[in-house]
Amino acid sequence: MKPLLDITDVSLSYHSLSGETPALSHISFQLMPGEFLAIVGPSGCGKSTLLNLICGLLRPEQGQILLDGTPVTSGDCRIGYMLQKDHLLEWRTIYKNVLLGLEIRRELTAEKLAYVNQLLSDYGLDKFRSAHPSELSGGMRQRAALIRTLILEPDLLLLDEPFSALDYQTRLSVGVRH
């Protein structure tokens, strides 16, 4: 079986006036289809940097990152990435926020809208579809951002600090459902 994600000898340094700071050095691993991987470590150890490399927001100075055998590029639709901050648009309702990726991709089909409604129900946000982000708790906002990512049905799902504001029950259900 071919790996879904293949990272080989990836390195990256941040450049500043005071010199170079290594962020990641010679990272290699594979992720097979259906596998889960948790990257844990203290603040500043490079977890978010690695996720930014995997999704193509950053380019490695060395090494390669392949998704299903092809190089990852910025804006790769095969990757869903939920950032640390939810980045919900305050002027849009929760429902409109969740639809954003589908609108951009022009994928607003009846099937996708039914899936949106199912996810809103599954994650306890169906009664808040007309609310704006400022009206929701941190955990509810994070669930909305998760739904916005899941609705695009990516081949690879990257979650940066995904559970920091989620309650225990929601944390348990994320891996079970998706």
Tell what function each PLM region has.
Residues 55:
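Helix-to-loop junction immediately C-terminal to a conserved catalytic motif
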Residues 131-134, 148, 152, 159:
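Conserved signature/switch motifs of ABC ATPase nucleotide-binding domains
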Residues 20, 75, 95, 129-132:
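Signature (C-motif/LSGGQ) region and adjacent switch/coupling loops
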Residues 92-99:
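Short coil-to-helix segment of the ABC ATPase nucleotide-binding domain corresponding to the Q-loop/switch region
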Residues 99, 110-128:
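Conserved ABC ATPase "signature" region
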Residues 40-42:
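The feature captures the beta-strand-to-loop junction immediately N-terminal to the Walker
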Residues 63-75:
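Conserved ABC transporter NBD signature motif
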